[in-house]
């Protein structure tokens, strides 16, 4: 069965007696549509029994150099939430989309109320995504498109080891702050053959305080330029 040395931190070890997961998922959704508007709403509840995950690391023998991280079945795991969405499109070239999502996870906890399974950063409870676009054809030979998109995510907390190479130092609660990332992009089409693309990614130059797991992998604002030419359309 599985036995893997994870970069000298610990040995991830499989368990032959694992039970299969059982999941019960319930979803309710509704949609309302008109010629220029579309709205959606949904709620869900997912209950997983015997969820397979990693337990707390431990030393098998006093002389072991690396701790073992075994796979186990969690007694109970629940996640629930909902999403609201709105899409609009007007005849003047403007269109927009907004979505809001709420997510709540419930993991088993120890006697101190700490999550016993923190192999990943917990989901951020609130997430808002925004997308807006304007498109206009100025003539038969020139068309432009402008698009602004962004996401806003709430803060979250996770309990992590102070030193992954020395788990005897214990754990500490780490807060991952809320953040927002935006992108502004524009395309300019000349005739049928030439298209110029320009973009500013991470528009407000956001940099995470620390990079870990699902933190955004960005080191600041990024400028992008692209040019495509379809030779067969000249």
Which positions does each model-derived feature cover?
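Membrane-embedded beta-strand positions in outer-membrane beta-barrel channels/transporters
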Residues: 15, 25-31, 38-40, 71, ...
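Conserved C-terminal beta-signal and adjacent last beta-strands/turns
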Residues: 21-28, 101, 119-234
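Surface-exposed extracellular loop regions of Gram-negative outer-membrane beta-barrel proteins
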Residues: 1-25, 45-69, 154-163, 205-218
């Amino acid at each position: 069965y599985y036995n893997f040395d994870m970069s000298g931190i610990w040995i991830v070890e499989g368990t032959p007696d694992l039970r299969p997961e059982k999941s019960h998922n319930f979803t309710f959704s509704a949609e309302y549509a008109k010629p220029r508007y579309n709205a959606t709403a949904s709620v869900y509840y997912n209950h997983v029994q015997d969820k397979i995950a990693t337990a707390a690391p431990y030393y098998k023998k006093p002389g072991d150099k690396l701790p073992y991280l075994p796979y186990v079945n969690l007694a109970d795991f629940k996640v629930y939430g909902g999403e609201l969405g709105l899409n609009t499109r007007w005849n003047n070239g403007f269109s927009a989309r907004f979505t809001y999502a709420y997510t709540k996870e419930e993991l088993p906890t120890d006697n101190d109320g700490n999550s016993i399974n923190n192999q990943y950063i917990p989901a951020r409870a609130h997430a808002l995504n925004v997308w807006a676009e304007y498109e206009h054809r100025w003539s038969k030979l020139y068309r432009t498109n402008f698009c602004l998109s962004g996401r806003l995510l709430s803060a979250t907390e996770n309990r992590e080891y102070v030193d992954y190479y020395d788990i005897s130092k214990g754990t500490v609660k780490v807060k991952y702050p809320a953040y927002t990332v935006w992108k502004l992009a524009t395309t300019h089409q000349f005739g049928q053959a030439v298209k110029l693309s320009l973009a500013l990614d991470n528009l407000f130059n956001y940099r995470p305080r620390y990079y870990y797991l699902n933190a955004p992998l960005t080191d600041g604002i990024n400028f992008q330029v692209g040019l495509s030419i379809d030779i067969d359309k000249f």
